């Protein structure tokens, strides 16, 4: 395939002001589109349909902007969904690109960022964990990594579908290759082996139980295994075990035998043959009841790195092929694609999608729909998982809707609540105070909408009202602004607010919201019963006398889960904040010492005490520490001393 003459990784629109942007003249519906046609070039690009508030209704790409946009003027040929979109269009924006492949990448980025109402939108706000092997230490560390891969002296393998999947792999690497997982600072301060050495999951390089050369051999074996050469490693270990037995080194032979068993176990649980699959993502879609589930299996080096289910938002008119095509473009917007994507359906413009992903990756990316053999079996396995996951979700949604209908009836809401917000706070005698908001609705917990509030104002120990006031003022003051700006703010407005407490808390919160100008939110306070027994809660709400629910009422269980989730989130948030405070050291009081330099110092000297005792020359020799910074550190710990 001839690669297009364009950058290897096309810049996003926001980062590329040189891309020509054309705005439509004022109008509405077909009128604004017809007026726009006079300005459009016969070139590739991306177009956006906007409503009266400037919100994106639809984002599309085209080989020829002029021809593609012209198709929207033929209303009678459009499906009902696009007819409604055209009728709501008040303005348009056009961005031209170098190639159609670049337009496809930009379209996927804009859809993911703007979430237009009439597009298929991938709801995926999670980052994916990777396996990282450090390379800037004599004895490399293996660990889980999440986030940007900015550490140059490190190798990465992944992605993995979940933290569980990568943790399982780390455990396997410890058992088979005896690699250390401790931090550099812990490594530098060990005086005897840790428990992992006792259970044969580490070779204890921290206390010289293994030479640097032998450890390097283990690292090389681990790299080979992660690259799909497990069979080769197994043969090599078998040879080493035989040699140890012949030399009557039975303890060493037994240790190697245990490593072979671990390797055999890992390979025996693999679902694919490394020789036939290698590096690929297996992607299958299943549709039912107007909804879709997309299952992605991550295969790297012939190993199954786990799978994850996605539920893209779309209308019931979208086909499985439509959903799969939109999913692939958006899914790889912020992550590198593997060389092979195995699909259960062909998608529209499959060659163009392959070209765009190849452009992004800087190498060939193939999209393939297998019809026989092991690859077909793997795709069928992913398809079965997609079907079963969607069946579970539909069943859960039906049950969730019944519970929400019960909540609406119980608290006299006009309709089933789409967004319930639950608030709680946590502190110890006024220290490290945090408030939290958790959100639930028809889809269950909306964890991307959870919020933490670090309480800024001075808090009198035990003054929970002051904490609640600050939290609600910040949340609803911002919410009012967002609500006035467009439909997204309206969608994020709660139908019901739950708080932990009784009549006093309910009255206080109503007073806070009245001061802000919020009068259309239903408030409910949940008070614990006598002896704080679960199941004997009292419910307080405006316009109703306090009441209890029957102990086995499903709605009672649901409301308890809402309250308990807010309490759990508040406790974990407070603990995280408290831990952050407790790990402060004297290094935090030195000007110019941020997180990166602090980490460099602790990794080099092992502790803040080691930094304090270090001489100026040793500080200047620390990687990442300039001479000026070293002098500042030395002067902090040795006031009055000359820094020669």
Curated annotation (Swiss-Prot):
Keyword annotations: Cytoplasm, DNA damage, DNA excision, DNA repair, Excision nuclease, SOS response
Subcellular location(s) per record: Cytoplasm
InterPro entries: GIY-YIG_endonuc, GIY-YIG_endonuc_sf, GIY-YIG_UvrC_Cho, Hlx-hairpin-Hlx_DNA-bd_motif, RuvA_2-like, UVR_dom, UVR_dom_sf, UvrABC_protein_C
Domain UVR per the UniProt entry, residue ranges: 231-266
Chain residue ranges for the region called Disordered: 1-23
GO cellular component, one term: cytoplasm
Molecular-function GO terms, alphabetical: DNA binding; excinuclease ABC activity
Pfam families with a match to the protein in the record: GIY-YIG (PF01541), HHH_5 (PF14520), UVR (PF02151), UvrC_RNaseH (PF22920), UvrC_RNaseH_dom (PF08459)
GIY-YIG domain ranges (all copies): 42-120
One example of a Gene Ontology biological process annotation: SOS response
PANTHER family: UVRABC SYSTEM PROTEIN C (PTHR30562:SF1), UVRC/OXIDOREDUCTASE (PTHR30562)
Family: Belongs to the UvrC family.
Quaternary assembly: Interacts with UvrB in an incision complex.
NCBIfam families: PRK00558.1-5 (NF001824), uvrC (TIGR00194)
Protein name: UvrABC system protein C
Organism annotation: Granulibacter bethesdensis (strain ATCC BAA-1260 / CGDNIH1)
């Amino acid at each position: 395939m001839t690669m297009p003459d364009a950058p290897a990784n096309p810049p996003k629109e926001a980062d590329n002001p040189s891309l020509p942007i054309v705005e439509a003249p004022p109008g509405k519906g077909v009128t604004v589109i017809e007026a726009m046609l006079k300005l459009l070039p016969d070139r590739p690009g991306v177009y956006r349909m906007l409503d009266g508030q400037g919100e994106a209704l639809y984002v599309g790409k085209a080989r020829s902007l002029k021809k593609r946009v012209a198709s929207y003027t033929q209303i009678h040929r459009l499906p009902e969904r696009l007819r409604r979109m055209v009728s709501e269009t008040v303005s348009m924006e056009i961005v031209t690109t170098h190639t159609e492949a670049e337009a496809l990448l930009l379209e996927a980025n804009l859809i993911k960022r703007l979430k237009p109402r009439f597009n298929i939108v991938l709801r995926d706000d999670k980052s994916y964990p990777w396996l990282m092997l450090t390379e800037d230490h004599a004895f490399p560390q293996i660990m889980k990594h999440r986030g940007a891969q900015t550490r140059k002296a490190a190798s990465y393998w992944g992605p993995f579908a979940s933290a569980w999947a990568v943790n399982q792999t780390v455990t396997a690497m410890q058992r088979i290759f005896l690699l250390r997982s401790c931090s550099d600072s812990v490594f530098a301060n060990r005086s005897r082996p840790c428990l992992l050495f006792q259970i044969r999951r580490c070779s204890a390089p921290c206390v010289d139980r293994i030479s640097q050369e032998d450890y390097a051999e283990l690292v090389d074996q681990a790299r080979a295994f992660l690259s799909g050469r497990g069979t080769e490693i197994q043969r090599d270990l078998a040879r080493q075990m035989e040699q140890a037995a012949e030399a009557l080194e039975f303890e060493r032979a037994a240790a190697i035998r245990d490593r072979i068993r671990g390797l055999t176990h890992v390979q025996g649980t693999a679902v694919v043959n490394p020789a036939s699959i290698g590096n690929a993502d297996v992607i299958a879609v299943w549709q039912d009841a107007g909804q879709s589930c997309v299952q992605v299996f991550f295969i790297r080096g012939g190993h199954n790195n786990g799978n994850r289910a996605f539920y893209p938002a779309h209308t019931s008119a979208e086909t499985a092929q439509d959903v799969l095509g939109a999913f692939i473009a958006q899914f790889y917007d912020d992550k590198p694609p593997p060389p092979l994507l195995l699909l259960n359906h062909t998608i529209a413009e499959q060659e163009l999608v392959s070209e765009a992903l190849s452009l992004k990756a800087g190498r060939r990316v193939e999209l393939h729909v297998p019809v026989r053999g092991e690859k077909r079996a793997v795709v069928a396995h992913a398809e079965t998982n997609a079907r079963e996951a969607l069946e579970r979700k539909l069943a859960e949604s039906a049950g969730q809707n019944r519970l929400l209908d019960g909540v609406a009836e119980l608290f006299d809401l006009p309709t089933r609540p789409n967004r319930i917000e639950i608030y709680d706070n946590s502190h110890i005698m006024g220290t490290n105070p945090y408030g939290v908001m958790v959100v639930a609705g028809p889809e269950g917990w909306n964890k991307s909408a959870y919020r933490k509030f670090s309480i800024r104002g001075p808090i009198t120990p035990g003054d929970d009202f002051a904490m609640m006031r600050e939290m609600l003022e910040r949340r609803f003051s911002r919410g009012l602004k967002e609500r006035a700006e467009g439909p997204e703010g309206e969608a994020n407005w709660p139908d019901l607010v739950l708080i932990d407490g009784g009549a006093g808390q309910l009255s206080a919160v109503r007073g806070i919201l009245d001061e802000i100008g919020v009068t259309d939110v239903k408030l409910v306070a949940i008070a614990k019963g006598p002896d704080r027994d679960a199941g004997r809660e009292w419910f307080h709400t405006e316009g109703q006398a306090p009441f209890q629910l029957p102990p086995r009422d499903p709605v009672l269980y649901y409301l308890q889960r809402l309250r308990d989730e807010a309490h759990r989130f508040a406790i974990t948030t407070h603990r995280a904040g408290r831990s952050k405070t407790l790990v402060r050291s004297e290094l935090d009081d030195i000007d110019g010492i941020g997180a990166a330099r602090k980490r460099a110092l602790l990794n080099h000297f092992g502790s803040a005490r080691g930094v304090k005792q270090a001489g100026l020359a040793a500080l200047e020799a620390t990687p990442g520490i300039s001479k000026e910074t070293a002098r500042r550190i030395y002067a902090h710990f040795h006031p009055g001393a000359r820094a020669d």
